Amino acid sequence: MQTFAEIALLREQIRAWRREGRRIAFVPTMGNLHDGHLTLVRKAREHADIVVVSIFVNPMQFEKADDLTNYPRTLENDLAKLNSEGVDLVFTPTPEVMYPQGLERQTFVEVPGLSQMLEGALRPGHFRGVATVVTKLFNMVQPDVACFGEKDYQQLALLRQMTLDMAMDIEIIGVPTVREMDGLAMSSRNGYLTVDERQRAPVLARTMRWVSSQMRGGRTDYSEIIVDANDQLRAAGLQPDESYIRDAVTLQAVSEETQQAVILMSAQLGKARLIDNQVVELTQPAAPVAEAAES
């Protein structure tokens, strides 16, 4: 497994593989890898001869300096895991390599609409940072396919729209959320949970499944469903953040034309912000509006 921190070395190797006619898959990460990330790597291997992984904690997508400083960095362990998975190349740039002129002078990429709505409204600038760094990494790696987790549902939708809008010849593959045995979606931020909080954390997934069951049972009073769901979260000691039921394709409000809806839920538990989602097939005409419930 090769490990490069410099763009020139990365590009030299990519060009060599291209000359050999190799198909390249790419998995961008911020490190602190868990089984969810490794599932992305395995999916990438199914679609290509060469698997490239990046590890870069992107300062452009953090709103709070403390969050950036405290984000877990476990490079040695990450490289060992990726080597065990047979990854061909790991790109580990520094912020100085990725943003040589600093963030203030960096050209940015922003996807209208999807960058500002839902999670984007809660975290201004976050998706601009995601779109910018992924665009730069795509330009460096030039992959045929790129794999992203469905846990970050809005991010996946945004990156699909970005590649379409920018005419990037890259297939974006969404990979189902990997869960712990008790249903908690795997996340690097789960490491922030105390022992007691970890025991309570699966309530988010259970509540989401309850919302899904209500919808599949025919309920269309989505705002009331979300209010009830938030009450369940509070009863378990979680602080509801933003929760929505939206059209699974557009992420706009559910309409009569909606065939698939997505439940998007988030909650604060101690130092960890937990997020999760589930797509639901609608069996009858949808309610016209489904907005966030007040926390």
From Swiss-Prot:
Compartments it resides in: Cytoplasm
E.C. number: 6.3.2.1
Gene3D superfamilies the UniProt entry points to: HUPs, Pantoate-beta-alanine ligase, C-terminal domain
Reaction(s) this enzyme catalyzes, per UniProt: (R)-pantoate + beta-alanine + ATP = (R)-pantothenate + AMP + diphosphate + H(+)
Residues reported in the UniProt entry to bind beta-alanine: Q61
Superkingdom, taxonomy of origin: Bacteria
General function of this protein: Catalyzes the condensation of pantoate with beta-alanine in an ATP-dependent reaction via a pantoyl-adenylate intermediate.
Protein name: Pantothenate synthetase
Encoding gene, per UniProt annotation: panC
